[in-house]
From Swiss-Prot:
Major place of residence: virion
Lineage: superkingdom: Viruses
The entry's keywords: Capsid protein, Late protein, Virion
Species in which this protein is naturally found: Salmonella phage ViI
Name by which UniProt lists this protein: Major capsid protein
Keyword DNA damage among UniProt keywords: no
One GO location term (cellular component): viral capsid
Taxonomy of the source species: Viruses, Duplodnaviria, Heunggongvirae, Uroviricota, Caudoviricetes
């Protein structure tokens, strides 16, 4: 009698495991990020504003800045472009640390230092490393040179599992184990500041209240906070475009000429081809990072219009996003979703026609650049030493740095403390950029 491959006892034992749904990864959502920011704001308010309760029933008519600042911090968080393109990691202090855990081959590869050992999970896996030791050569998919190019004699090698006779000798001097290990490397992110100042006369305050019924304090507060946020958005857009690598599959040196590099009789056909171009370059981001394909698009208004006119852009989600405060009419704007699922944002100040692709994963740890807000808003109030005119200032503190796998080179000594932010031109594989010529 032959032994059953699967018995009823096996089924009873493992069926609950098979039927149990895997728990979904809970990312650090935009709501959680905003909660951390408001907590930082509340802690700063308590330590620095110096607002105390007035005696008795006077409390009900005394205006305070604490709820105003918290409300401003809540309002600013959703319209920050970093929430859509960057990983967001709020700081709980002026300095923070980010870590990169790198898996590497062991000493068996002949290297003498940890940082010189070949890194795992970054390129194609060496199919012979844990097996028969065959050195990989040829095409990574297994095709010969003749099959790909039509001629040639190069044949692709295939690493296989080792035979039992070799496996029985693992650990001996003639047949050592293939070894792997890890290195943990760290970098720092330091909060930097922005600040604006304004003063006004008592006469202006009195006249604005008497004639227009407006509080100058509130008006100037909105002006300064909105300007700071607008400047931050422009910093993030410029940083993203500065550090993105250039298109690799289309165009020349990151410049795509619609008239020469894209085939099509009519402008509409060429505009439709833009989506395929985006898809190919987005796949390239996935190959370079091993994290995922590009899923965000930042482009000039005319490029977005070309995609819309070709029927590739669905504008319906814009109305839904309005209710989630995902649209910033004074900075970047959410335009819609492409037919391949990419979310499209418009750079309203763009002069050159361009497209920048970005990858952002499901969690705040999975992105090419990290935005690290510390104190959303710091407010200072005083009076002129001779004029006694009211003065007001706002500051914000935040840090920005590249993903540690980008800013820490593969051959960096694990014992060396990295203090640079990793923002360098044409260096971040989580982003790809291309200039578009002859769009119309």
């Amino acid at each position: 009698m032959t032994k059953k491959l699967v018995t009823e006892e096996m089924r009873k034992q493992w069926l609950p495991v098979l039927q149990k749904e895997s728990e979904a990864i809970q990312p650090l959502s935009a709501e959680n990020v905003t909660i951390r920011l408001m907590q930082n704001q509340a802690e700063w308010n308590a330590k620095n504003l110096g607002e105390s309760d007035a005696p008795g029933s006077v409390n009900s008519t005394v205006g305070k800045w604490q709820p105003v600042l918290i409300d401003m911090a809540k309002r600013l968080a959703p319209i920050n472009i970093a929430m859509d393109f960057f990983g967001v990691q709020p700081l709980s202090g002026p300095d923070g640390q980010i870590f990169a855990l790198r898996a590497r081959q062991g000493v068996g590869d002949g290297s003498t230092t940890a940082q010189a050992r070949k890194e795992l999970f970054m390129n194609e896996a060496d199919s012979g490393y844990s097996g028969d030791g065959t050195v990989q050569a040829g095409d990574p998919s297994g095709f010969s040179q003749a099959e790909i190019e039509g001629s040639g004699s190069v044949v692709t090698t295939i690493g296989k599992g080792m035979p039992s006779t070799d496996a029985e000798l693992l650990g001996t001097t003639t047949n050592p184990w293939a070894r792997v290990g890890i290195t943990v490397q760290k970098a720092t992110v330091t909060a930097k500041s922005r600040g604006l100042y304004a003063d006004y006369s008592h006469e202006l305050r009195q006249d604005m209240m008497a004639i227009h019924g407006e509080d100058v304090d509130n008006i100037l507060s909105d002006v300064m906070v909105t300007e700071i946020q607008a400047e931050m958005n422009r910093e993030f857009i410029r940083t993203m475009n500065f550090s993105a690598v250039r298109f690799k599959k289309f165009g020349t040196n990151g410049v795509v000429d619609i008239a020469q590099d894209i085939s099509g009789r009519w402008a509409l056909e060429k505009w439709k081809f833009l989506t395929f171009m985006l898809e190919v370059e987005a796949n390239g981001i996935g190959v370079d990072t091993r994290r995922g394909k590009g899923n965000r698009v930042l482009c000039s208004p005319n490029v977005a219009s070309a995609l819309a006119m070709s029927g590739m852009l669905d504008y319906a989600p814009v109305l839904q996003e309005n209710t989630k405060l995902a649209v910033d009419p004074t900075g970047q704007t959410f335009a819609g979703v492409l037919s391949n699922g990419m979310r499209v944002y418009v750079d309203p100040y763009a002069v050159a026609e361009y497209i920048t692709l970005a990858y952002k994963g499901a969690t705040a740890l999975d992105a090419g650049i990290f935005f690290a807000p510390y104190v959303p808003l710091e407010m200072y109030r005083t009076q002129g030493e001779t004029t006694f005119s009211p003065r007001m200032a706002f500051k914000t503190r935040y840090g920005i740095c590249a993903n540690p796998f980008v800013q820490i080179p593969a051959n960096q000594d694990p014992q060396v403390y990295v203090t640079a932010d990793g923002i360098a031109q044409d260096s971040n594989p989580y982003f790809r950029k291309g200039l578009i010529k002859s769009l119309f």
